[in-house]
Structure formats: structure tokens, C-alpha cells
Amino acid sequence: MADYFLTVFDPSGNTLVNEQFEAEHEEAAKTHGEALLKEKELHSHTHRLVNAAGKLILFHR
């Protein structure tokens, strides 16, 4: 299991969500991150999902 970090920003740049979770691999992390965004109704906000090394997995602006 690896650590992943999902961060969501409002239009003015303030952080709305900054969550850490574990996933088996990048594709599972991406699926989980997208589910969290839909659950919180934040999928249209600027967001990023990175692994612990800083690799960008998912990004929307």
C-alpha cells in the first residue's frame, strides 16, 4: 500500500480538502480520488492527486 494525497482548491486558491489515503496502486488511487471528489461534489473545482513522492496522478484546473 502506498500513500496518496488529494488536495482541492476553491477559485481564490484556498484549500477546501487536503486528505491522505492509502491505495494498492496508482489506478486504484485515481478511482478512489475521483469517488471522493464526486461524494463531496467538488469534481469541478481545481484539484490534484499525488503520491508520496510527489508524482502527479490526477489534475483538474
UniProtKB/Swiss-Prot annotation:
Q: Name one Pfam family in it.
A: YhzD
Kindly provide the name given to this protein in its UniProt entry: Uncharacterized protein YhzD
**Organism of derivation:** Bacillus subtilis (strain 168)
The upper taxonomy is: Bacteria, Bacillati, Bacillota, Bacilli, Bacillales
